[in-house]
UniProtKB/Swiss-Prot annotation:
HAMAP family: Trp_synth_alpha (MF_00131). Belongs to the TrpA family. The active site is at residues 52, 63. Gene3D superfamilies: Aldolase class I. Signal peptide: none annotated. This is Tryptophan synthase alpha chain. Pfam families: Trp_syntA. One of its GO terms (cellular component) is cytosol. Tetramer of two alpha and two beta chains. Its EC number is 4.2.1.20. The gene is trpA. The lineage of its organism: Bacteria, Bacillati, Bacillota, Bacilli, Lactobacillales. The alpha subunit is responsible for the aldol cleavage of indoleglycerol phosphate to indole and glyceraldehyde 3-phosphate. It comes from the Bacteria. Pathway: Amino-acid biosynthesis; L-tryptophan biosynthesis; L-tryptophan from chorismate: step 5/5.
């Protein structure tokens, strides 16, 4: 199966719009998890394509300082993977949700139980940045025949054969990493980035979204020209935490209503 997320994104593409997926950290709110659906509703109102929800973890190897701090704020409030899933089971959302988590919390929760419990939520995609493709067998058998896509990350350092392998096996969408390193790093894009993104978009049968370092309107325009859209994390997380709703509202609107 694993169709809902891809079909939803492809329908937006068919309207000539760029895709825009914001990232939020679950529990990073004045009200903790009680504010999760408030944030989701706010983002849905701006016309986002889907919403990526981060699971806080004590050793976030792929997170930049903004998201790492957000995770720490969430953990201090007592947020856990179990409490997040329980909250997500309370209410369905208008757009698909994508969980971004490290593998350790999933392993501790129980992989089979984790996948089963997500079936009663609006989560249609999973991103596990520290789970190598060769070790996806830890979770893939539990995803068979379920509407839950394991989204691959493809970076500039991924070899051509490896790219082909990842994309042929991809579900949901392809997460194209614009900058090597942690999230939130901006600028300093490699000269061959646009060529790389165009190549991925040409060979993939599902949408390709660009993330890591996307933080300006110029980034949105640039990456919509060479891929299907963008994923924005640090700018959204920082804006929500600092109460800059109107500023990020305009930014999100520009991204979610970008006309190809």
């Amino acid at each position: 199966m694993t169709k809902t997320l891809t079909k939803h994104l492809q329908a937006i593409k068919a309207e000539g719009k760029g895709l825009f997926i914001p990232y939020i950290m679950a529990g990073d709110h004045d009200k903790g998890l009680d504010g999760l659906f408030d944030t989701i509703s706010f983002l849905e109102a701006q016309g986002v394509s889907a919403i990526e929800i981060g699971i806080p973890w004590s050793d976030p190897v792929a997170d930049g300082p903004v998201i790492e701090l957000a995770g720490q704020r969430s953990l201090v409030k007592g947020t856990s993977l179990a409490s997040i899933i329980a909250r997500l089971q309370e209410k369905k959302t208008q757009v698909p949700l994508v969980i971004m988590t490290y593998f350790n919390p999933v392993f501790q929760y129980g992989v089979e139980t984790f996948v089963a419990d997500l079936q009663n939520t609006s989560v249609k995609g999973l991103i596990i940045p520290d789970l190598p493709h060769e070790q996806e067998s830890f979770i893939k058998p539990y995803l068979e025949n379920l509407d839950l896509a394991l989204v691959p990350l493809v970076s500039l350092t991924t070899g051509l054969e490896r790219q082909k392998e990842l994309i042929e096996d991809a579900r949901g969408f392809v997460y194209a990493v614009a900058i090597n390193g942690v999230t939130g790093k901006t600028g300093n894009y490699r000269d061959d980035l646009d060529k790389h993104l165009k190549h991925l978009t040409e060979i993939a049968q599902i949408p390709v979204l660009t993330g890591f370092g996307v933080s300006t309107l110029a980034d949105i325009k640039r990456f919509n020209q060479v891929s299907d859209g963008v994923i924005v994390g640090s700018k959204i997380v920082k804006g929500l935490h600092e109460g800059m709703q109107e500023e990020i509202k305009d930014f999100i609107y520009a991204g979610s209503h970008y006309q190809k």
